[in-house]
Amino acid sequence: MDDSSIDPIGLALNTVRKYVASSVAMSSSMVLRPTAECQREETTMPELFIDFITSLDGYGAAEGWPGWWGLEGPEYLAWLEADPDADSTILMGATTYRLMSGFAADGEPGTEALADMEKVVFSNTLAPPLSWGRTRLVAGHAVEAVREMKETGARSMRTMGSLSLCRSLLTAGLVDRFRVVVFPVITGSSGRENIYAGYPDVALEMINSRTFDGRIQLLEYVPTILAGPPGTNEVYA
């Protein structure tokens, strides 16, 4: 699975800042967890998270805007540093890999933490060996590879950027948690690549929400892919 169809630069700038910050510490003092009423039946299968940072109208980046749209605040940054999922395996496509490994090679502050994390790149265009440490290249069908990782692995997984990869994994019903941080800005004229373009219909069960710095909204859902509009009583996954 290659994510070369997206315009990656602005999205990657937001992505690298999020993951650099979230890899600094693994304190659990600010961890958000589902309440007992919302938790589903426990399973030994590792979970897959999709993480996105978006404007209100669903864009991950916009022409001329800084990372995080210049709206990050101390509460949000503290939550990133307390991220309990920093030891998860990171999944990405080829374009995201090229950008992120380039940031690391250039010594972008904090990217040394990413070098210590286990990473899997899905691509039919990259060739081994990959230069970024602890990175495994998987060619072929990404959905089937991730399905096998969930069935046989022990570590939770989360995506980094890679919009087309995320779309494929969600459509296949492999995503356990859909986590989005919404920033209070609409980038209708400058937004690049709407994150939800090409998605199927998805029912979302909210299990967590939080407001940071009085303006940034964290929303965490359990997704269910729908076979049709409400009332059809059919789901794909």
Where are these regions (language model features)?
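Extreme N-terminal basic, low-complexity initiation segments
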Residues: D2-G10
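Low-acidity, Ser/Thr- and Arg-rich intrinsically disordered low-complexity segments
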Residues: S4-S5, T15-S23, S27-S29, R33
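Enzymes that bind and transform nitrogen-containing heteroaromatic metabolites
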Residues: V31-A237
